[in-house]
């Protein structure tokens, strides 16, 4: 089932997230994450982004040009990552990211070239994966949400503040324009 994606500065995006004890308890959440990610055409989605403070993300490896190493039973295009532990290694790479929780913003951030990922699958199996670039960058981005971080928190504070200020002004202008259009339509 589709759920609304929370937008910054919603505090649920920064809250602490609970580890999942039993994957059987989150099967509906997995479906909701995948359905929502599909509707929003995202590369991945973390549970906090739909208001559920649990440590689970879904990601679509094909967006990063990778074959899916652990296809979901619900939708094989997606990989489900529960209770991830990351060990980022290799060179740092600067690349442009966007986020469903910060619509219409993208910016360059630094990510590690390789990620050693330990996680639980949707079937409750303990797994390990070595993710290479750019898939590793996508995994790091989604797992940052479980730490209460968005990509802007990986940027220089002044650059992030400038970007967010510009974003707020753009949103405010869009609201004013929408109100004017609604008012004109009512005449």
Placement of each model-derived feature along the sequence:
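Positively charged
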Residues: 1-187
């Amino acid at each position: 089932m589709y759920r609304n994606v929370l937008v910054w500065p919603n505090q649920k995006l920064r809250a602490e997230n609970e580890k999942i004890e039993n994957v059987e308890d989150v099967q509906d959440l997995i479906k909701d994450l995948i359905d929502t990610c599909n509707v929003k055409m995202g590369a991945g989605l973390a549970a906090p982004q739909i208001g559920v403070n649990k440590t689970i993300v879904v990601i679509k490896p094909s967006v990063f040009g990778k074959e899916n190493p652990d296809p979901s039973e619900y939708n094989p295009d997606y990989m489900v990552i529960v209770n991830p532990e990351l060990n980022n290694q290799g060179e740092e790479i600067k690349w442009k990211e966007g986020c469903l929780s910060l619509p219409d913003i993208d910016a360059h951030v630094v990510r590690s070239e390789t990620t050693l990922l330990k996680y639980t699958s949707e079937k409750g199996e303990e797994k390990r994966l070595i993710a290479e670039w750019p898939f590793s960058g996508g995994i790091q981005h989604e797992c940052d949400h479980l730490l209460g971080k968005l990509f802007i928190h990986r940027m220089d504070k002044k650059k992030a503040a400038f970007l967010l200020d510009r974003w707020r002004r753009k949103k405010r202008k869009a609201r004013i324009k929408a109100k004017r259009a609604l008012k004109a339509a009512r005449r």
